Amino acid sequence: MAFAPQFTVTARLLRELETIADLKAKIATAAIQVTWTPRLQQDSRQRGAHASTAIEGNPLTLAEVRALEGGTPLPDHTERAQREVLNYFASLRWIEKRAKQSKPITHEDIFRLHQLLAGGVMDQGEAGRYRTIAVRVGKHLLPSPDLVSGFMRELLAWWNGPSAEWSPVLTSAILHYQFEDIHPFADGNGRAGRMLALWELYRRGFDTHHIFSIDEFYGEDRPRYYAGLAAVPGAGGDLTAWLEYTTEGVRTTLERVWLRVQQLAAKSGPKKTVLRPSQEKLLRLLRDHHEGLAPAELWAALAVTKQGAAHILAPLLKTKLIRRVGTRKNGRYLLA
């Protein structure tokens, strides 16, 4: 039986989608300098990691998440608490790469994502394998283990096919809910479901620059988030109220991104920094290497000499887009 989500396109839903489209266009055409993008990406990545793990009870603050990504150990927190956050970052890097591929999404992709996200931090079951035990969320008894694979097959068929007819804002929310309703793994379904929703936005080109995360909206009012999920079965499976809630979240998140863009524009002033391709490449490298790069690693990655690297680095250091930390002998370059 094919998966066919039930919902009604209400006036509220249309208003939210129209506002979202307007905000998205403003952000895309706001002359966002490439120099800003790594900062926005880093901020979004860290806020998403903090929010999604905090929803599940992780105790790290946003400041601690930022420090952990930068390579600072947190001795006051358990290894598991830190591993949950590091797993989130690893999963995010994976979906960023996978979203660029046009091939259909498979069970193996879902397994791989779950392995990255839940490896070493599960209370029960095995990361990367569908559950073999019965689970319940509140009063809601979820599908029996023998039905999980079939339900996931139906969801993937919809995701790889009919979902393309709808806005990614809607399909990401539908994926999120349906994945949680199936609850295919013994543990880690919440983080995985939110990551699937983000994956859908990436692969459909909605968040091309990867500069926002709706998880922060969910995390700010967890009771409302859980109530939104729990209300769907009581509505006979109708997703309308859930979609109205999630589109409100996307709109709120984009409003915040737009504010951050304006703040960055104000700080940078009217003069724009024009970057050479090698400098853009360096910023992308530093975005992906959160622990930074040593000078020798930087020269090798850019295929330049020490002198050539100096010409690339100087304008970025002067405009405070990057910074150097450590000693003269053991220093590293990081995004500012």
Give residue spans per PLM region.
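FIC/Doc superfamily catalytic core
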Residues: 1-336
